[in-house]
Structures are given as structure tokens and as C-alpha cells.
Swiss-Prot record:
EC top class, as a word: hydrolase
Gene giving rise to this polypeptide: frsA
EC id: 3.1.1.1
The name this protein goes by in its record: Esterase FrsA
Source species, domain of life: Bacteria
Keywords: Hydrolase, Serine esterase
Catalysed reactions listed for this entry: a carboxylic ester + H2O = an alcohol + a carboxylate + H(+)
Molecular function via GO: carboxylesterase activity
Protein family according to the UniProt entry: Belongs to the FrsA family.
Pfam families: FrsA-like
Length: 414
């Protein structure tokens, strides 16, 4: 495989690429309070992006590696879109966020190519894929360099999957009225068909960001994991996010009886952040096809409908929402009106009785997902479970919460 040559071809300078923070042209709120969240990281002065250390470390990145790349970005004296924000260096060069993380990924890519041990090589490929995804973060539409980093991440992920334990199959799903989408089915050792979890990820993540979830939590329990990208990013980039947020996942669910490795009678959905919006919609609209739905830090009502809550959210996250909705130059008022339509309570779903068992995990004082959203989910279910996850120590409690959630899913699938 000529991965290095592909990197050179994709990133070859052709014109002045737009800088990430300029892609969504909203009216800024001005000064914002500091934000810290287990799933989204924290706002740090002089950075446009939220720095999501917990999730990056959870995905296998060494904390020192994160600091090294950040230091290279900070030390750059190249031209920036905003002199006050380190990660706004213009163009694919030293100091640019995408450049520095992609360069770091290429180091691991080279290690993977040089490594003779297949499993270790697979680990290096996975590491490279994760770093390329961080390079592309927060995956805004129209970010040419980020889209090229995503392409490299997908290639590295495919290389990793050929070498790591278990089996991964790349699958194409037909969606009427538009382009087909691609998903990854991760299967544990043994003979299928397997009970399967359909992963519904957050808006600022790619489907390839969840390998750790499969490897540490689902595979040891003999459960397969099926991922697809959220609308408007990655392999689903030709689909815009609409109020029918679960459209793509519904078509995947309906196709599962034709997938021989999946036991379509034992399927659950698991939603992170806005992915919970998708998962809970599935619980209502596709209850005969689902044994259970689990959510973590769900974005299903408050953030979408409460102006005060939206004011507490960092600029980057609002840019992500605007980008997914195709509202790159809309006013904040227009964005608020549109977001309100995505509330599952406003849509008339949440609050109605749902036959599907639903669990929702939350952190107290989470700026993106208050406890009320999780209570709304679990109280709407005929078999609901509310799970509070203490914030500190953040990594240990995150792991403990995931163990409890996957155990709950296993009981309903197996």
C-alpha cells in the first residue's frame, strides 16, 4: 500500500485552503463562561477547539503526545485568522491544527509499515487513524483539509482492522432517494450470527472513533458493533442532518435481516450525545426491531430548545450544529429556531410511553445534557433506568459507567 504517497497527493498544496474557524459565519456571543464536560473536553483560553483529552486518551493517545502537538501549534509564528486563537493558523503548514496532527499520524503510519508483528502493526495503524481523526476535528462541512485527513483515517482504519483480533467488514447500505452509505461491522471471535449494537455517535466524531468501545466493552461479551457516520460527515457526507435524524440508522436497521453475521432479533442502539437523539427516535419508531436503547449524555431536548443553555455552549460546538444543519451563514436566531425542531419533546415523541427499554447515563451539571433530559428518556420508557456518573475521577468513572451500560445492554440482548 502506498499510504505515504497518498498522503503527499491529498495534502499537496493547490490553493489557499479555508481555515476551520471561518467556515461557519455566525454572530458571536462574545465572552463565554469556561466549559468542562466528560464527553466533550473543556474550553481552554486561546483555543477555538474544545480540547477533548479524556476521549483522545480513551481512544489510545498518550497524554504527552497531545501536549507535544499542542506545543507545536502554540509555538508557530505563522499567520492566523485570529491572533488570539492558537489553532487558527492559515494554510497547511507548521502550526496549523490539521497539519500538526496529520504529521503526528504519519509517524505512526510509518511505524505500522515497518513493524513485522501483525498485531503491533495493527495497533500502530489504529493509532494513526485516531490521530488523523483528531486532525479533522471538529469535522465541519467544507473543510477541505479535514476531509482529506478523514480519508486517510479511513484507510488507516481499514489497515488496522486486517491485523487486529476479530473480524471487521465494510458494508454498504442502500438509502432510497440518495447515495448509499458505508458502515463497519465489528465482530468478536466465534461463530455468528452475533447480538449487535448499532452505534449512534456524536456530531463531532467519526464512526472510526469507537473502536475502543467495541474492543473493551462489547467484544469481551460476544457482542458485535455496527457503526455508520452521522448525516453530513464521513461516509454519510452526502446526507444532510434533518429533523428526521434517525433516517439513515432506520434504513440500516431494516437491512439487518439480510446481514448473515448479525442476529437481527437481538439488536440494541447506543447513542452518545446527539447520537442519543437518533437512538431514542429509533426506540419509538422501530421498537419491534430493538431490544434496548442506551444513551450517554443525551442531547434530546434542553440544549435544542433552551436559549440559556445554548448561551453556555462553546462557539465550536454551535458551529458544529450549524454545519450539520447546513446553516453556515445563518444568524443565531435562525439557528435557535431550527434547533428547536430537533427536540424530541417538541416532535411529540419524548413524554409518550415507549415500549423499548431505555437507559440514560448523565453527569451532574453537564452543560450539554442536564439530568432532566435523561429523566425524560427513562420516565418515558416502560422499562427505564437512570444512571448518574460521578465526574471525578473522570477516567475511572467513565469506564465504570460504560461497564454498567454494556452490562445492561448484554442482559437485554443475551
Amino acid at each position: 500500500m502506498t499510504q505515504a504517497n497518498l498522503s503527499e497527493t491529498l495534502f499537496k498544496p493547490r490553493f489557499k485552503h479555508p481555515e476551520t474557524s471561518t467556515l461557519v459565519r455566525r454572530f458571536n456571543h462574545g465572552a463565554q463562561p469556561p466549559v468542562q464536560s466528560a464527553l466533550d473536553g473543556k474550553t481552554i483560553p486561546h483555543w477555538y477547539r474544545m480540547i477533548n483529552r479524556l476521549m483522545w486518551i480513551w481512544r489510545g493517545i498518550d497524554p504527552r503526545e497531545i501536549l507535544d502537538v499542542q506545543a507545536r501549534i502554540v509555538m508557530s509564528d505563522a499567520e492566523r485568522t485570529d491572533d488570539d486563537l492558537y489553532d487558527t493558523v492559515i494554510g497547511y503548514r507548521g502550526g496549523n491544527w490539521i497539519y500538526e496532527w496529520a504529521i503526528q499520524a504519519m509517524v505512526w503510519q510509518q511505524k505500522a509499515c515497518a513493524e513485522e508483528d501483525p498485531q503491533l502493526s495493527g495497533r500502530h495503524w489504529l493509532h494513526a487513524a485516531t490521530l488523523y481523526n483528531i486532525a479533522a476535528y471538529p469535522h465541519l462541512k467544507g473543510d477541505d483539509l479535514a476531509e482529506q485527513a478523514q480519508a486517510l483515517s479511513n484507510r488507516a482504519y481499514e489497515e488496522a482492522a486486517q491485523r487486529l483480533p476479530g473480524t471487521m467488514r465494510q458494508m454498504e447500505f442502500t438509502v432510497p432517494g440518495g447515495a448509499p452509505i458505508t458502515g463497519f461491522l465489528h465482530m468478536p471471535k466465534g461463530d455468528g450470527p452475533f447480538p449487535t449494537v448499532l452505534m449512534c455517535g456524536g456530531l463531532d466524531a467519526m464512526q472510526t472513533d469507537y473502536y475502543s468501545l467495541y474492543e473493551r466493552y462489547f467484544a469481551p461479551r460476544g457482542i458485535a458493533m455496527l457503526t455508520i457516520d452521522m448525516p453530513s460527515v464521513g461516509f454519510s457526507s452526502k446526507w444532510k442532518l434533518t429533523q428526521d435524524s434517525s433516517l439513515l440508522h432506520q434504513h440500516v436497521l431494516k437491512a439487518l435481516p439480510n446481514v448473515p453475521w448479525v442476529d437481527h432479533t437481538r439488536v440494541a442502539a447506543f447513542g452518545f450525545r446527539f447520537g442519543a437523539n437518533v437512538a431514542v427516535r429509533l426506540a419509538y419508531l422501530e421498537s419491534p426491531r430493538l431490544k434496548a436503547v442506551a444513551c450517554l449524555g443525551p442531547v434530546v431536548h434542553t440544549l435544542l430548545s433552551d436559549f440559556k443553555c445554548q448561551q453556555q455552549v462553546p462557539e465550536m460546538y454551535l458551529d458544529v450544529l450549524a454545519s450539520r444543519l447546513g446553516m453556515h451563514d445563518a444568524s443565531d436566531e435562525a439557528l435557535r429556531v431550527e434547533l428547536n425542531r430537533y427536540s424530541l419533546k417538541v416532535q411529540g415523541l419524548l413524554g409518550r410511553r415507549c415500549p423499548t427499554p431505555m437507559l440514560s447515563g448523565y453527569w451532574k451539571n453537564d452543560p450539554f445534557s442536564p439530568e432532566e433530559d435523561s429523566r425524560l428518556i427513562t420516565s418515558s420508557s416502560a422499562d427505564g433506568k437512570l444512571l448518574e456518573i460521578p465526574f471525578n475521577p473522570v477516567y475511572r468513572n467513565f469506564d465504570k459507567g460504560l461497564q454498567e451500560i454494556t452490562g445492561w445492554i448484554e442482559k437485554r440482548l443475551c
